């Protein structure tokens, strides 16, 4: 049976089962019907066998019957191709391979240290015509040369290294000394060991002992009391100078509230001194007072008569003559005149307006 026929039979049974029971068939329903169960298993086995087989056959490309002419090989072209990046024989170079030149060297091969055969090759023979045309030159191999004077070394050792050196001599200075003096001197060209204790730097025991004795004598002659007194005097002088400097500096006045009233400078009242009765003649003083009283009485008596005479004269004069005009005395004359145009008063008024 073909797979299509098996599938159609299974579908027909499923539609019939759905019409009867109003549901799709389950596994138990399929197992109950033996024929349908066999069809399901057969369909499954056929489908699984088809999947294992290759779906498409591999096509074999047969070579074409067209004959092509062979390409001639160019032996002169280099085998190693250079790309856009730096390469050597087709291989990309790194930073460390830049010293190599591409055609001769590669990062895998190292050049042998042996000399190349071209080094042992004979130089080309010179033509006789060329030798005749050339101008004669001075021979470089000089037979006689003036002797060079033996020079000393220009640089000198610094002073801080001279202390640690125990008469080291350079080869040149050693040779010069041999020429001047026949005495044999050892060629000492090695600096002394830095770890070795050097006796020349330290002091001798005698020097240390003498310095200790001097210090002991200085301590005996040294008076502590005198030193303390001199020190205290210096401190007292310093304190005096500081206090004097402080006094010279004027204290800074604090800012206070501005005036709200005008300042007036008034003279002080005279002090009432009690009259002293010493050296005073009381009788003369009493007589003067009595005479003054008499004069006042006489003047009072005479004033009544004068008033009567004046009234009669004024009445006659008022008929014929106009009364005399008197200038009016202002009240401000009784007070002290104000200094209105004083510049100080202007400043005061300006401050009061604020």
Curated annotation (Swiss-Prot):
It is found in: Cytoplasm; Nucleus. Its main location: cytoplasm. GO terms for biological process: DNA replication initiation; double-strand break repair via break-induced replication; mitotic DNA replication preinitiation complex assembly. One of its GO terms (molecular function) is DNA replication origin binding. Residues 250-266 have a biased composition (Basic residues). InterPro entries: DNA_rep_checkpnt_protein, Sld2. Keywords: Cell cycle, Cytoplasm, DNA replication, Nucleus. CDD domains: RecQL4_SLD2_NTD. It comes from the Eukaryota. Residues 47-133, 159-184, 220-277 are annotated as: Disordered. One of its GO terms (cellular component) is DNA replication preinitiation complex. Residues 47-71 have a biased composition (Polar residues). Belongs to the SLD2 family. Has a role in the initiation of DNA replication. Required at S-phase checkpoint. PANTHER family: DNA REPLICATION REGULATOR SLD2. This is DNA replication regulator SLD2. The gene is SLD2.
